[in-house]
Amino acid sequence: MSSFNTQNKNVLQTPIPAPTPQSQLKQFVIGGLAGMLSSAFTHPIDSLKVRMQLQGEGTGVGPKRGALKMLVHINQTEGFFTLYKGLSASLLRQATYTTTRFGLYDLIKDIVAKDDKPLPFTQKIMVGMLSGAGGAIVGTPADLTMVRMQADGKLPFNLRRNYKNVFDGIFRISKEEGIISLWKGCSPNLIRAMFMTAGQVSSYDQTKQLMLASGYFHDDIKTHLIASTTAAFVAAVATSPLDVIKTRIMNSPKTVTGELQYKGTFDCLSKTLRAEGFKAFYKGFNPYFMRLGPQTILTFIFVEQLNILWKKSQSYFK
């Protein structure tokens, strides 16, 4: 991000250089690449989280397995590599969702900035929410396909979708359910993405800015680790309930009468709350944070390193 790469102690008061079209495009590309690289490492944890979120759905009964027991159960019944199902969709999701939200964050921030000075944190939150919404709209089709591929092993054999890959999944959803169905669950996904980007990108931006301004930290790996860990925790607490709702809506089959299991975000929220209680919204929180923590840390470290490589390449070709 444009404000991520400053080493000035007085970063709170230092004007930010005016952005160029090339630098703005670079942030879209770097954001997407960083998201894809981190997702390749954390996808099995995300699959584990999805399975845990779907436990006892609609009834509140049935096995309540923790992360370790669920991992052992999946390994025994389906094999460990089942956790890599949906990886192609996960990579496409990062290529669309993360590319858009990271790129838009810098783009919008540069537009609303006054006198080339860093934005107040409240404005960063608003920018984060706007860029998250844009990312969700672009990334929902891949996200929907990923959730279905991850959850397929939980369904009875006759109900499994058996998508070959993300593109096969998107094609079949469009053909069998209509193109609009690719945005099934977009509402909770959009809300989640708004809170995620505000909690994740804005928190990282602000935490790093304050750390550098204190004079006790430098723009190095230690600062990046602390800032990204803080951002991961804030984002996980804020978005876990929305992630559970999103997962359930995206994975929900039609009932025997042909109706959808959930009419929308608030219907899913109320049904889940009545049947399972508030704790249901934090089902799978441990693997959620175990995945979001490393993914957030890796994403921002990759962003920082890719920015360094970009600067070196620019000086090399001058």
UniProtKB/Swiss-Prot annotation:
One of its GO terms (biological process) is oxaloacetate transport. One of its GO terms (cellular component) is mitochondrial inner membrane. GO terms for molecular function: dicarboxylic acid transmembrane transporter activity; malate transmembrane transporter activity; oxaloacetate transmembrane transporter activity; succinate transmembrane transporter activity; sulfate transmembrane transporter activity; thiosulfate transmembrane transporter activity. Coiled coil: none annotated. Its main location: mitochondrion. Belongs to the mitochondrial carrier (TC 2.A.29) family. Keywords: Membrane, Mitochondrion, Mitochondrion inner membrane, Repeat, Transmembrane, Transmembrane helix, Transport. It is a multi-pass membrane protein. This is Probable mitochondrial 2-oxoglutarate/malate carrier protein. PROSITE patterns: SOLCAR. Mitochondrial solute carriers shuttle metabolites, nucleotides, and cofactors through the mitochondrial inner membrane. Catalyzes the transport of 2-oxoglutarate across the inner mitochondrial membrane in an electroneutral exchange for malate or other dicarboxylic acids, and plays an important role in several metabolic processes, including the malate-aspartate shuttle, the oxoglutarate/isocitrate shuttle, in gluconeogenesis from lactate, and in nitrogen metabolism. It is found in: Mitochondrion inner membrane. It comes from the Eukaryota.
